[in-house]
Amino acid sequence: MLHRRNDLIALVVLATAGACVTPAPARTPAAPTAAVRPIVIAHRGASGHRPEHTLAAYALAIDMGADFIEPDLVSTRDSVLVARHENEIGGTTDVAAKYPDRRTTRTIDGRPVTGWFTEDFTLAELRTLRATERLPFRSHAHDGREPIPTLDEILDLVVRRSRETGRRIGVYPETKHSSYFRSIGLPLEEPLLAALARRGWTTAAAPVFIQSFEVGNLRALRPRTGVRLAQLIAAEGRPADAGTSADVPATYAEMRTPAGLARIARYANAVGVEKSLVLPIDSAGRRRAPTSLVADAHRAGLAVHVWTLRSDAAFLPKAYAGDAAAEWRAFAALGVDGIFGDFPDVGVATLGR
């Protein structure tokens, strides 16, 4: 997911984040709870085992029993939605070797970024690229094998595997840099809704959540679709569209207060929150007391999905003593409704199918 921060920053242990969460007044009926177990959401597919955002990663996640797969969506120059964590693809493909002259600098969400960008390539050009593993300490055995998938290919995979397995598999797309793409004439939401509608996925009963770190696009989606929406909330910073409207909060901290959650509930069905906002970890890697965020969100009528659990030693907090399953159990015990993980096999084995 991030803007779900540069993955390598996460090598430094996530620290104290949830200070702004406060108890909410008992005021909202019909709060959701984790009925049986949290849903297992395969973060970028089974990205702990295969290069992220590839059909191989999504298919493996489905085979492992994930309830949802998560494609991050960006646009090509010819308005086709494809799955990449960022529109800058230098770190996840072999683009530098194949198109060295396309390297450039763009301003994305107010900051300069240098690299290769999906919006500078047609789909046909992107088809010539192959995915590579982002993180140096994970296996690179599958580098150079998988192309960049389109949204339609991902949805076709989900429909086909649901039919073959008799299991309802969900899709949890994130619109990346929505305001930026709209500003350059490549909006993400319209082709996403059209692709979902072609599969008959237009209501809350559909196996779909649409997520975003921005606010305005989700608010605009609410009257246009019945599918469930999830507001992403980071531990720090602000939405990229902050300041564009009185309806967009100035910071993520404001959004996770009881009043902020109540406002989110007017347009969204869930919040996707950085895990430290639910169960903080101190600078020594020790667990602190859980925050009130899960209870606050449930009072507002919102489901709570946390991100991102990773089994790698570089990411797993010391508090779990190398036991990745213990982290899944800890969040399940706190009543969260869904968990994003790079290793969905660990989540399914720990929580059950």
Go through each PLM region and give its residues:
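Phosphate-group recognition and catalysis centered on beta-loop-alpha active-site segments
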Residues: 2, 9, 18-353
